[in-house]
């Protein structure tokens, strides 16, 4: 899984590659109602959560990556995909107030861009919770350490930084994400022969109060484009 954030004049583009078992069922992005809030996201049908969600009414967006546990458990009561949805519905959300022992390790990114932009990174490794404020004026890339080694991430990060001068549109950023997508059971993955591949890419483009959500399902070679959300 990769996430990239690219700031623009009066806006930004946040993009996500999803690496998952290619047989895991997913719905393309659509609107759902949660506690009177309209939330837009692609839905994981196994647990009902998501990895990328938008609350356009409140101008907030969130995405999540899996992370490595220091002492992994067999099961966790609370789904990371459900945690993501809670973070986008609850405007007073604070991960530090949650029962962290019930949540698998993850990196949760939340960005509120309504009046006073706040971009937070929550990193939970089952031992420590670190909370960082992200500089919204600087581009950034994240990578899931459950699937990619530190060395592999460094390669991808350097490629991202070298490409920044051309990463100015949704199409160019999507092409970058396509270039780092992985085929079925890629040798790059730390988890071997688990039926994993890059199954989709999701990109949200916000600029001067106009926005759109672009989703490409690589399994079905199908595009979903939602505008004026």
Roles of regions detected by a PLM:
Residues 1-229:
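N-terminal nucleophile
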């Amino acid at each position: 899984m990769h996430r990239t954030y690219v700031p623009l004049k009066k806006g930004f583009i946040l993009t996500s590659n999803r690496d998952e078992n290619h047989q895991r069922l997913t719905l393309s992005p659509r609107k759902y109602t949660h506690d009177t809030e309209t939330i837009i996201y692609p839905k994981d049908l196994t647990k009902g959560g998501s990895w990328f969600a938008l609350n356009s009414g409140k101008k907030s967006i969130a995405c999540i990556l899996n992370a490595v546990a220091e002492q992994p458990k067999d099961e966790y009561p609370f789904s990371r995909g459900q945690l993501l949805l809670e973070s986008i519905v609850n405007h007073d959300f604070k991960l530090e107030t949650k029962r962290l022992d019930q949540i698998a390790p993850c990196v949760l990114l939340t960005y509120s861009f309504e009046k006073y932009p706040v971009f937070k990174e929550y990193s939970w490794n089952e031992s420590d919770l670190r909370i960082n404020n992200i500089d919204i004026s600087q581009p950034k890339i994240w990578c899931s350490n459950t699937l990619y080694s530190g060395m592999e991430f460094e390669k991808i990060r350097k490629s991202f930084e070298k490409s920044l001068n051309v990463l100015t549109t949704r199409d160019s950023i999507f092409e970058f994400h396509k270039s780092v997508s992985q085929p079925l059971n890629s040798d790059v993955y730390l988890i071997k022969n688990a039926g994993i591949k890059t199954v989709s890419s999701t990109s949200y483009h916000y600029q001067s109060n106009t926005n759109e959500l672009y989703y490409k399902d690589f399994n079905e070679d199908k595009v979903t484009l939602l505008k004026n959300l």
